[in-house]
Amino acid sequence: MNYTIIGTGAIGGFYGGRLMNAGRKVQFLLHSDYSFVRSHGLQIDSCDGSFHLDNVDCYDSTSKMPCADVILVGLKSTNNHLLKDLLSPIVGSNTTVVLIQNGIGLEEDLQQLFPGLAIIAGLAFICSSKIGPGHISHQCYGSINLGNYSCPDDRFQDILKDMQDAGITAAEVPYDEARWKKAVWNMPFNGMTVALNTSTDKLLGNPSTRRLIYEQMMEVINAAQALGVKGLDSSFADKMIEMTDAMVPYSPSMKLDFDNHRPMEIPYLYSRPISEARKVGFDMSKLAMLEAELQFIQDSYLKK
């Protein structure tokens, strides 16, 4: 199978780079880095072993790309309004799209745009950032959970195996469980680092915010349980706290968007899960308050 990477940044660049480094045929869509990567390749600095990729098959428009077997979407969900135009030229009858994005409801919305498309949710547990043109810094972790939304199982298993063969710690997790498990970490830490203008280690180093982070995690878990999602209980919140304690001090993607005055992923990270929970009578009150704070913060710099 050949792979196409849409969004060659901290996430797409890392996973696409690992696949290419393992010998898979991979093509990359680039924007501002196109000329640089075409001339100089991709550099992945990784805690698991750094590598450089020369002769990268890169494009500046999907209209110039051949149809893909598998498309990995690593764009921020704030750009999902572009997906119909981006994907239409490269989606064939047997194409699978893996949405490596944060939030709830992403696959449902993409399926409405492409009713027959095979879709997989990709939930990355990784600390990585783009630090320069064609230059990715992978600091720690790097696993990915795949949740099958609408993909034939044999194709799903082939993609899972390709990732594992490329040295990626990839696992199959039931779709709803995969999405909500990632939300347990994302909803507290992304928003709180913005609202308090801080980093993950400082949030957990203070007893008051450590307790609040845990309470927010349990709110996500309780919402998921109210929606019938299996595989989530308080032990998972404990695991996420323990994992974050062991991380290098980290600014999540939403904090970087805030720092650079870009739109934040509020709709899919907050508004959608809060709305879904309300439909079954569960009020995510602490996270709804955080959502309102984030909206105020974003409006203060986007509407100037």
What are these regions, as identified by a protein language model?
Residues 164, 214-304:
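NAD(P)-dependent Rossmann-like dehydrogenase/reductase catalytic/cofactor-binding core
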Residues 3, 25-27, 97, 119, ...:
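Hydrophobic anchor at the start of a short beta-strand
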Residues 89-90, 112-118, 133-188, 192-232:
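Internal alpha-helical scaffold of NAD(P)-dependent oxidoreductase catalytic cores
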Residues 50-135:
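Rossmann-like NAD(P)(H) cofactor-binding subdomain of soluble oxidoreductases
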Residues 28-30, 146, 274:
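Short internal beta-strands
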Residues 32-36, 78-79, 104-105, 154, ...:
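Short alpha-helical
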Residues 1-53:
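NAD(P)+-binding Rossmann beta1-loop-alpha1 motif at the extreme N-terminus of oxidoreductases
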